Amino acid sequence: MKKVVIPKMGMATTEVDILTWKVKEGDTVKIGDIIVEIESEKANVGIESEYNGIITKILHKDGETVPVGEAICEIDES
């Protein structure tokens, strides 16, 4: 099981808002697929999957504020 985390987006950014999930639990994703749109202080950004697999768990809902470095979903690579 792999975890997708919020990447560091600049020196001042400590948290981001989840705008819209582009996937749901059970969806198959490939490396490079946009899985979620987030908003930082400066921009809206699409977070790409770093793994091929199935989304097994979404850990934060649309509208939630999430600290940089925190896991937002889990992907099963098997």
Region locations from a protein language model:
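Acidic, low-complexity mobile loops and tails
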Residues: 1-35, 46-52, 57-59
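Short hydrophobic beta/alpha edge segments that flank linear recognition/processing sites
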Residues: 30-48, 67-78
